[in-house]
Amino acid sequence: METKGYHSLPEGLDMERRWGQVSQAVERSSLGPTERTDENNYMEIVNVSCVSGAIPNNSTQGSSKEKQELLPCLQQDNNRPGILTSDIKTELESKELSATVAESMGLYMDSVRDADYSYEQQNQQGSMSPAKIYQNVEQLVKFYKGNGHRPSTLSCVNTPLRSFMSDSGSSVNGGVMRAVVKSPIMCHEKSPSVCSPLNMTSSVCSPAGINSVSSTTASFGSFPVHSPITQGTPLTCSPNVENRGSRSHSPAHASNVGSPLSSPLSSMKSSISSPPSHCSVKSPVSSPNNVTLRSSVSSPANINNSRCSVSSPSNTNNRSTLSSPAASTVGSICSPVNNAFSYTASGTSAGSSTLRDVVPSPDTQEKGAQEVPFPKTEEVESAISNGVTGQLNIVQYIKPEPDGAFSSSCLGGNSKINSDSSFSVPIKQESTKHSCSGTSFKGNPTVNPFPFMDGSYFSFMDDKDYYSLSGILGPPVPGFDGNCEGSGFPVGIKQEPDDGSYYPEASIPSSAIVGVNSGGQSFHYRIGAQGTISLSRSARDQSFQHLSSFPPVNTLVESWKSHGDLSSRRSDGYPVLEYIPENVSSSTLRSVSTGSSRPSKICLVCGDEASGCHYGVVTCGSCKVFFKRAVEGQHNYLCAGRNDCIIDKIRRKNCPACRLQKCLQAGMNLGARKSKKLGKLKGIHEEQPQQQQPPPPPPPPQSPEEGTTYIAPAKEPSVNTALVPQLSTISRALTPSPVMVLENIEPEIVYAGYDSSKPDTAENLLSTLNRLAGKQMIQVVKWAKVLPGFKNLPLEDQITLIQYSWMCLSSFALSWRSYKHTNSQFLYFAPDLVFNEEKMHQSAMYELCQGMHQISLQFVRLQLTFEEYTIMKVLLLLSTIPKDGLKSQAAFEEMRTNYIKELRKMVTKCPNNSGQSWQRFYQLTKLLDSMHDLVSDLLEFCFYTFRESHALKVEFPAMLVEIISDQLPKVESGNAKPLYFHRK
């Protein structure tokens, strides 16, 4: 005797349109574990009943283990009204109907099994005639008609039961052609009942006996709900949802659905996983041949637990499994509005490619059976929109993944997947243009998850900005006027709250630092392979950072007066300064004490992990000691090779001569000292508190339960005695001078990318120098953009000044590097490109190299300081203008006059120039005048190689091509006007 258990799940009214949202009521019929025989071993009845209402929070209609949470991707508004208006039958009547259908299906399954067995016996002799199968179906129909007891309340046109059988002659190599059925809602001509399960049985079997489809439907009241295998649409549903029917695929696409195995020898219950189509994921492949499975992967609506049989691993593509996108579109979930187990409705798909695939059969046509077309979905090209809401609601593919959490697979929504969900594997949403997020179904506007990736704010990341002066310069930013309210950050980047830190660049990661210059400043340029430079911060944040970060002195005074008990506050382990306001964070104290961001961790000599900045260069401890011993010991090392040995962590001790040469090329100098930012302010912090205050007593013992470090309170200074002189000193220290600004914005030395393996021909050397000049010009443009006062000029004047002075700036910087790194013995173009006498001759510009070398020797004679060099460099930027003048000539004259005054002031402050300041100022200005004569010769040679670049095989980067193309006609026409200090 069979024992049948029914498990009811809640289900909404509009199952067709709200398949993925409403709760479901699925009744399953299962046999007792002790009474399974060969006849009922694979029998399963799936009846679906509809229950009105939305999703209840606490449902009591079924076991809680049978509930299935809805997918976040398919979640919709629960307040949408249902579309059915018919009355709903009680659940008791549904159970009685299910029991009747179960008994009826037993006879039907026996009939189909007999047909399958007969095929196995006749398969060796030939194909089985479909007449016998057709007669079995007619007998079943008569049986159902005789046992009909409940008419349907739906009024529709009666349609005879039709089945379509394909001929065995159309099978090639065992491949069976496709058998299709138009709709599972098929009624007998003489029966007044419509959509009753007694009139709804359709059996489709191909002559090869592999593909057979059975479907069962149930009519509850006036709303027929079908099994997911033969999903249909009643007449009361929306007209834009087409009737669905069972689809029996060929062996290359699908397996038997809802039918027993064609051969009892390969019967089994375990599901298999097919590599081509991922039919099931619960168990491994059991047999490469005919396998019958019991699918364990349910649909999102939890009603697709139907029986499937698979012919071969390559054919395991049935409806009840989640198949891969490449193998099938039947198992893919199409839309939360349209049924998840049926094809897309042709009436609602705009632009979708839907074809009618009809397979002709001679034998069937002889028997009078009509061919019923079935929509064959080839490819979904556009999203299917609901006729009511117009929302995009396609999730094209559901892909089983072996790992990962399901909650991270879909976007949007607050729904969670219950542990009792019938999905046994996570579902991954494919990143296609039809993919959906939770916000799409709720009608919310789509939000860009990456708002800062606008593209217009990253001017340095565009191709036009790599080689465009106007693109790099951009609109003006807050300059030297001390405007603290300027928006240094672009609109597309989130601004961090100002915590009063003096140096925002202290938060830049050390990976962004390329190195330090001879003065010790760290710069945060990233240099790419093509010579392009991208900043770690936005390019529009390159204005003078000190001005926008220093709070005004009067603001500090007001904050100090408002906090009387300055000494009673506690810091986070750092000493408390008497006059530091309370709102200054510990990060400010760290930035003041350190003075600059942490240097890079890579040694610039051998590539080992750097221990700090030694002798002006970020190096490791080994190279530091080696350089000190080599220079102080005055060793004369000789290279056994060609002075191009590889110096790295492993081979740095092989050749001391090449190692010392690389140390010099990196800029190591025994006299170099790393300058600290706000060094004067640091000295004030270290000296004045110690002079005015007695040493504090030792801190009290720390309690074991407390984790704070106690700082002894310092004596509060008197407002009339101590605070006033300190305020005057602080105000002077917090007011940055232009010289301090120029020191901090000085760019880093770039590498030329010189390939020592190539011969040192004139073509190779000149091409390398041009590429280096292109990289340096990008730095010059970025340096000019943050130059105090330069952004006050119109953009046209900025571009004109850079175009006229680029050669002068490059040669002057070359002389400075040669002076600092080689004491003007060589031309220090880059750390990897140093010209000696031999390379000067090989470059075909020996006389020009000698002229630049003479400028470097003048630096040695004058013992030029870094402060003087930075101001003179700005004056060279402002030393050549058009004959007709600039667009804003008054602003240009004012800026140039201010920097001349700064140079005069710097010369006067220098202690070595006491009594001789005017003489030194004269020498420095004469040196600036001599640069014009050298630059005129350099430009003449550059223009010649630029014209004959193809013949000479000399390469020019795009930045130089733009500058030279604009500058060449102006210079040759005599439009350039150099500005001299000592000439008329």
Swiss-Prot record:
GO cellular component terms attached to this protein's record: chromatin; cytosol; endoplasmic reticulum membrane; nucleoplasm; nucleus; receptor complex
Outcome following mutation: V180I: Decreased mineralocorticoid receptor activity
Consequence of changing Q776R: In PHA1A; reduces aldosterone binding
Keyword DNA-binding attached: yes
ZnF bounds (NR C4-type): 603-623, 639-663
Membrane topology, as annotated: Peripheral membrane protein
Known outcome of mutating E796R: Decreased coactivator binding
Listed result of changing G633R: In PHA1A; reduces transcription transactivation upon aldosterone binding
Phosphoserine modifications at: S250, S259, S283, S287, S299
Entry's localization field: Cytoplasm; Nucleus; Endoplasmic reticulum membrane
Region Hinge, annotated ranges: 669-725
Effect on the protein of changing K782E: Decreased coactivator binding
Record domain NR LBD: where: 726-964
Record note on what altering S767Q does: Strong decrease of transcription transactivation
GO annotation, biological process: nuclear receptor-mediated steroid hormone signaling pathway; positive regulation of non-canonical NF-kappaB signal transduction; regulation of transcription by RNA polymerase II; signal transduction
Principal place of residence: cytoplasm
Result after altering K785E: Loss of coactivator binding
Subunit structure, as described in the record: Heteromultimeric cytoplasmic complex with HSP90, HSP70, and FKBP4, in the absence of ligand. After ligand binding, it translocates to the nucleus and binds to DNA as a homodimer and as a heterodimer with NR3C1. May interact with HSD11B2 in the absence of ligand. Binds the coactivators NCOA1, NCOA2, TIF1 and NRIP1.
PANTHER family, alphabetized: KNIRPS-RELATED PROTEIN-RELATED (PTHR48092)
Name of the molecule in the record: Mineralocorticoid receptor
